[in-house]
Amino acid sequence: MTTLFDILNTLNNNNNNNNYTGCKRQYSINKRVDIIPSMDVTLTNDKLIIETELTGVSKNDIDINIKDSILIIQGEKKKSIIKNQQQQQQQQQLENSNNKENDEPSIEEFEEDVKSKSELNKTTLNTTENKDEDKTTQNINKEFISERSFGNFKRYLNLSEILYQLDLNSIDTQFENGLLTITIKKKFDSSNTIKININ
């Protein structure tokens, strides 16, 4: 009978498991892996519980799948500053696309535009001085201290030894306080022997 320690040994020992190394090689070509999250695996009488630490990761940035008997948890841990900048850029793009639809001015708007251009020419000299001051006071993001890890993360768990015992239709996932919990119930009849009837 396979113990939990056997499963973890198989996972960590690349030389003894061709499926694991093949999977690792195949997926690491596409993206560089910056973070390998910590994982706890518990096998009880009725279920398999996998807990993965993903502090600071949004649940929308996590991808979970099972391929060739290997559970793959992957995604990206983004800096909060970058997230905010991306959201602002998306909002600006939406606003710009909405403004382009309403680009043609009415007669009143055209007359106001002509007046504003003449006023603008008068104030050009004053604004050039203000622009130079604005350049010096612009906010520049500098990292004073950066100790946290960011980037792509990926973690594998080889389930080939116990996959026949698991009911994959019962997979339940929860993500709370930076902890991803995957629960897979065991089948009622988990024997790997199949009875074949003769016709």
Swiss-Prot record:
Coiled coil: none annotated. CDD domains: ACD_sHsps-like. It comes from the Eukaryota. This is Small heat shock protein hspG4. Keywords: Stress response. Gene3D superfamilies: 2.60.40.790. Residues 30-199 form the sHSP domain. SUPFAM superfamilies: HSP20-like chaperones (SSF49764). The gene is hspG4. Residues 83-105 are annotated as: Disordered. It comes from Dictyostelium discoideum (Social amoeba). Belongs to the small heat shock protein (HSP20) family.
